[in-house]
Regions:
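C-terminal regulatory/interaction regions
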Residues: 83-152
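Metallo-beta-lactamase
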Residues: 1-79
Length: 152
């Protein structure tokens, strides 16, 4: 929501300043990560003197700098996803997520809280969908209905 007279934007969870919003795959939504990236670029064009996230706080950070950080984060996450798919071809999103770089509370993937693994796998699928839409990876569904990813 943008209030033009005050150059004020209510960001919701779209831009959070001290954590990265979880961009996940949604049934019926093609390439949710691409939608998010395009939306970040679009809101970056607004003049914002005040940017208000739905929760947490801005930590005094400039909204434009934060948008740039989020775009860089997803660029790095895409590179990490592609690297892991190359390393373990014909793998599931869960297997790929286990090899990716996360800020974890546990020492390893198995100690990562199950709810956080759920978020990580959803985000991994969103990044795989993006790479698939760009023609970088392909998804094959095996005889048991399991989605498996390989580089093209």
């Amino acid at each position: 929501l943008y209030y033009e007279k005050k150059n004020l934007m209510f960001l919701g969870d779209h831009v959070l300043f001290d954590i990265t919003p979880n961009i996940t795959a949604w049934f019926g939504v093609k390439d949710s990560l691409n939608n998010y990236i395009n939306s970040l670029k679009k809101i970056r064009e607004f003049k914002m003197d005040t940017a208000l996230p739905a929760h947490r706080n801005t930590k005094g950070m400039n909204v434009y700098d934060r948008i740039d950080q989020l775009l860089e984060h997803h660029k790095a996450r895409l590179a990490d996803t592609e690297k892991v798919v190359k390393m373990i071809p014909n793998s599931t999103a869960y297997e790929i997520a286990a090899y990716m770089k996360w800020q974890m509370r546990g020492k390893n993937w198995e100690e990562f809280p199950i709810s956080q693994r759920w978020f990580a796998v959803g985000e991994t699928i969103a990044h795989l969908d993006y790479l698939e839409a760009k023609g970088i990876v392909k998804c094959d569904i095996d005889s048991e209905g399991v989605h498996r990813y390989t580089l093209i």
